[in-house]
Swiss-Prot record:
This is Putative [LysW]-L-2-aminoadipate/[LysW]-L-glutamate phosphate reductase. Involved in both the arginine and lysine biosynthetic pathways. CDD domains: AGPR_1_C_LysY, AGPR_1_N. One of its GO terms (cellular component) is cytoplasm. Belongs to the NAGSA dehydrogenase family. Type 1 subfamily. LysY sub-subfamily. Keywords: Amino-acid biosynthesis, Arginine biosynthesis, Cytoplasm, Lysine biosynthesis, NADP, Oxidoreductase. It catalyses: [amino-group carrier protein]-C-terminal-N-(1-carboxy-5-oxopentan-1-yl)-L-glutamine + phosphate + NADP(+) = [amino-group carrier protein]-C-terminal-N-(1-carboxy-5-phosphooxy-5-oxopentan-1-yl)-L-glutamine + NADPH + H(+); [amino-group carrier protein]-C-terminal-gamma-(L-glutamyl-5-semialdehyde)-L-glutamate + phosphate + NADP(+) = [amino-group carrier protein]-C-terminal-gamma-(5-phospho-L-glutamyl)-L-glutamate + NADPH + H(+). It comes from Caldivirga maquilingensis (strain ATCC 700844 / DSM 13496 / JCM 10307 / IC-167). SUPFAM superfamilies: Glyceraldehyde-3-phosphate dehydrogenase-like, C-terminal domain (SSF55347), NAD(P)-binding Rossmann-fold domains (SSF51735). The keyword Transport does not apply.
């Protein structure tokens, strides 16, 4: 049994971590912190957990974490905050699983460029040692590390959809277009006025159409697979959903590529993966991925279509942004690191109909 602490447990992702870890056979949640709600019962902030947990939130501090005798610490903090915690946790011998961006990018200077930090990352050695927590690409690194950087939600969906094509050198890497649609829960517990219901309902609204910070992760990971620079034009949109991300990507083919070539690439990379399904079906109700069939799960559904007229490929992916895009992927990586079954605590099927 592993003892777990969640730093920043009162937010949307913190609540999802609590919910999932309470169903994990090898985890006991012993500590959950919140500056705002310290001293309050957890179920009063996360009403869905009433009857499942009687802990109270505590003030966040290293001393509180050490006093709890935790083995693993999940950090669900705003960007720029985890970097203050992780070095101390690692020094204390704990496994740190960070759901912010603070350890995702390998180049220290990228934090100035993409996150507007006043200086490069202050812990370049720890940054290098951290594993990018996308299990299907970095399983070996995740097993061996003490710091897991959980990928961004839209980055996860984008990378998984394109990775087989990039790895197989089936597309041109100089200009890939990625369009993402994300639900309102992606804004977290403290969004802007534009995340209020009357602004968000019945809307498809682009935001940060150029220079979105998830671009850095997508390019980093795809470039590693390609062995050369991959350039991605990434544009997200806010849409009228509570949960979910849907990605559509477009890329030029690198040569005369057939549909069987595409199938071989996707099956070769994902055919044995527990949490990735290839959805491309001429029969049935679901011809391509859909958010409806992944919500509430750790699945990534991917699909593709060949456009022979323009010599391009269109790719699709769908995930639950709070599970596969955050808490679920964190737990999947935790399971790998600790030698537990990869799907422990994550064996969910989407309710249907919803």
């Amino acid at each position: 049994m592993r003892r777990a602490c969640i730093i920043g447990a009162s937010g949307v992702i913190g609540g999802e971590l609590l919910r999932l870890l309470l169903g994990h056979n090898n985890v006991e949640v012993v500590c959950a912190t919140s500056r705002r709600f310290a001293g309050e019962f957890i179920y009063r902030v996360h009403p869905n957990l009433r009857g499942f947990i009687n802990l109270k939130f505590t003030q966040p501090s290293i001393d509180a974490v050490l006093k709890s005798e935790s083995d693993v610490v999940f950090l669900a903090l705003p960007h720029g905050e985890s970097v203050k915690w992780v070095p101390k946790l690692v020094e204390s011998g704990l496994l740190a699983i960070d759901l912010s961006a603070d350890f995702r990018l390998k180049n220290p200077d990228d934090y100035v460029k993409w996150y507007h930090w006043p200086q490069p990352h202050p812990y370049p050695d720890l940054l290098k040692a951290a594993a990018y927590g996308l299990p299907e690409l970095h399983r070996d690194e995740i097993k061996a590390t003490k710091v897991i950087a959980v990928p961004g939600c839209m980055a996860t969906a984008s990378i998984v959809s394109l990775a087989p094509l990039v790895k197989g050198h089936l597309i041109n890497n100089d200009f890939i277009v990625v369009d993402a649609k994300i639900a309102s829960s992606g804004a977290g517990a403290e969004g802007t006025v534009l995340d209020y219901h009357w602004h968000r309902t019945h809307v498809v609204r682009p935001y940060q159409p150029v220079g979105h910070r998830h671009t850095a992760e997508i390019e980093q990971e795809l470039s590693l697979l390609a062995g050369s620079q991959v350039n991605v034009a990434f544009t997200p949109h806010a849409v009228d959903m509570v949960r979910g991300i849907f990605v559509t990507g477009h890329a030029r083919l690198s040569g005369s590529i057939s549909e069987p070539d595409l199938w071989r690439a996707y099956r070769g990379m994902y055919g044995n993966e527990r949490f990735i399904r290839i959805v491309k079906d001429k029969a049935g109700l679901a011809h391509y991925p859909s958010v409806k069939y992944v919500v509430g799960t750790n699945m990534v559904d991917v699909g593709f279509e060949l456009d022979q007229r323009l010599n391009r490929v269109v790719v699709f992916s769908a995930i639950d942004n709070l599970i596969r895009g955050a808490a679920g992927q964190a737990i999947q990586s935790f399971n790998i690191n600790q030698g537990f079954p990869e799907d422990e605590g994550l064996r969910f099927i989407t309710p249907y109909p919803v």
